[in-house]
């Protein structure tokens, strides 16, 4: 069996970057992936301006006295454009263009207004004090966003500040989702004996929406090999990626691997993690394929650890960053068998001494989904590690925005 890192690397090596692009206005482009380097067409600021309400001064006027007359005012959008006499200052507001020749801006709190209309400064300013120089933030010609960057509520306003109204993005990834199993029933319908609700398809659709994919609901499949084949052929004509849950184990009714081999190719279908050992990755004729385990916890873990980076690559992100890991002190004994990388659900917190502590949230069976609701991290127990005693150090992986 492949390790998690081996499986992840094997997937990402095979996946191509997208080629189809479209131009979108900034509002439509939120959370999409930039398809080219974005070059600033202007300087930001585009002119020297004041960082404070105060007075613009020339240092040469302050060599003999800290008292000056006031020559006029400069407002944002209405700059001072008159002749600037010597031995005088210009009243200026935040963001206003500074008069030509200004060496510094003295904030108004450091100024005394005299009865004769002059002003006196409490101290000699430093050169360039409280001045925002042209191009200080962004210079014309700078690469402000690289190809493969996600367009976020932080980066999009930057583009707006540069006067860029639309951006070239990769086409939204289309992902088809289906569940398999005679025992599954649509959420909201009454259960009969031996039936369970199809939570996996619901879960996967929610996760895909958070990853900003276009979701295609392909419904429920019965445990029938001919139906599997028919559905897989139809799905790959609609989607860039097809995700199934269930049918990837070795039971008599588990047809996913056999059908995938028939109509496409299987790259791998077992990985050394718990939960989530039966995970299939391969390719249909026109779409990539991921087969998640049927157990809800296993499906969520494999989506988080394997499908999430796969989607990032197919969306055009240049590099998927592994989630951060931290050391924590286990506050209770943890059961673990040697042989597989184990992702146990846990809850971490900072104790009174400033140390990170973590506790298990209960039974860790792959069918026990309620523990996820009480969790905020995975307790990551290495493949070669056995049982953990309270007080030992373990690795935790806090949930990112996908599970938040």
UniProtKB/Swiss-Prot annotation:
Binds 1 Mg(2+) ion per subunit. InterPro entries: MoaB/Mog-like_dom_sf (IPR036425), MoaB/Mog_dom (IPR001453), MoCF_biosynth_CS (IPR008284), MoeA-like (IPR038987), MoeA_C_domain_IV (IPR005111), MoeA_C_domain_IV_sf (IPR036688), MoeA_linker/N (IPR005110), MoeA_linker/N_sf (IPR036135). It catalyses: adenylyl-molybdopterin + molybdate = Mo-molybdopterin + AMP + H(+). Its cofactor is Mg(2+). Its EC number is 2.10.1.1. Coiled coil: none annotated. Keywords: Magnesium, Metal-binding, Molybdenum, Molybdenum cofactor biosynthesis, Transferase. One of its GO terms (biological process) is Mo-molybdopterin cofactor biosynthetic process. CDD domains: MoeA (cd00887). SUPFAM superfamilies: MoeA C-terminal domain-like (SSF63867), MoeA N-terminal region -like (SSF63882), Molybdenum cofactor biosynthesis proteins (SSF53218). One of its GO terms (cellular component) is cytosol. Pfam families: MoCF_biosynth, MoeA_C, MoeA_N. The keyword RNA-binding does not apply. GO terms for molecular function: metal ion binding; molybdopterin molybdotransferase activity. It is an enzyme of class 2 (transferase). SMART domains: MoCF_biosynth. Pathway: Cofactor biosynthesis; molybdopterin biosynthesis. Catalyzes the insertion of molybdate into adenylated molybdopterin with the concomitant release of AMP. Belongs to the MoeA family. This is Molybdopterin molybdenumtransferase. The gene is moeA.
């Amino acid at each position: 069996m492949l390790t998690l890192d081996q499986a992840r690397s094997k997937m990402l090596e095979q996946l191509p970057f997208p080629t189809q692009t479209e131009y979108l206005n900034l509002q439509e482009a939120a959370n999409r992936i930039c398809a080219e380097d974005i070059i600033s067409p202007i300087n930001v600021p585009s002119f020297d301006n004041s960082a404070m309400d105060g007075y613009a001064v020339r240092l040469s006027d302050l060599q003999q006295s800290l008292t000056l007359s006031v020559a006029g005012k400069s407002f944002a959008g209405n700059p001072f454009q008159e002749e600037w006499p010597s031995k005088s200052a210009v009243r200026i507001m935040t963001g206003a263009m500074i008069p030509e020749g200004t060496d510094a801006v003295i904030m108004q709190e450091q100024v005394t207004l005299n009865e004769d209309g002059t002003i006196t400064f409490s101290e000699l300013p430093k050169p360039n004090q409280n001045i925002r120089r042209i191009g200080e933030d962004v210079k014309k010609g700078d690469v402000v966003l690289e190809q493969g960057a996600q367009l976020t509520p932080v980066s999009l306003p930057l583009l707006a500040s540069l006067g860029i109204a639309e951006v070239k993005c990769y086409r939204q990834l289309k992902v088809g989702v289906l569940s398999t199993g005679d025992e599954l029933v649509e959420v909201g319908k009454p259960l009969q004996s031996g039936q369970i609700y199809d939570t996996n398809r619901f879960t996967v659709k929610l996760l895909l929406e958070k990853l900003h994919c276009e979701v295609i609901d392909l419904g429920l499949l019965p445990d029938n090999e001919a139906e599997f084949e028919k559905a897989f052929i139809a799905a790959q004509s609609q989607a860039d990626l097809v995700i199934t849950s269930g049918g990837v184990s070795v039971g008599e009714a588990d047809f996913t691997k056999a059908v995938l081999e028939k109509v496409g190719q299987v790259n791998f279908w077992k990985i050394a993690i718990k939960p989530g050992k039966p995970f299939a990755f391969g390719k249909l004729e026109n779409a990539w394929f991921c087969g998640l385990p049927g157990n809800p916890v296993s499906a969520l873990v494999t989506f988080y650890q394997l499908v999430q980076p796969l989607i990032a690559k197919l969306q055009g992100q240049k590099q998927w960053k592994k989630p951060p890991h931290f050391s924590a002190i286990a506050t209770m004994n943890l059961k673990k068998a040697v042989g597989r990388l184990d992702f146990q659900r846990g809850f971490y917190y900072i104790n009174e001494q400033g140390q990170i502590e973590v506790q298990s949230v209960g039974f860790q069976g792959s069918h026990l989904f309620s523990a996820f609701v009480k969790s905020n991290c995975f307790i990551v127990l290495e493949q070669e590690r056995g049982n953990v005693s309270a007080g030992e150090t373990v690795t935790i992986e806090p949930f990112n925005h996908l599970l938040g």
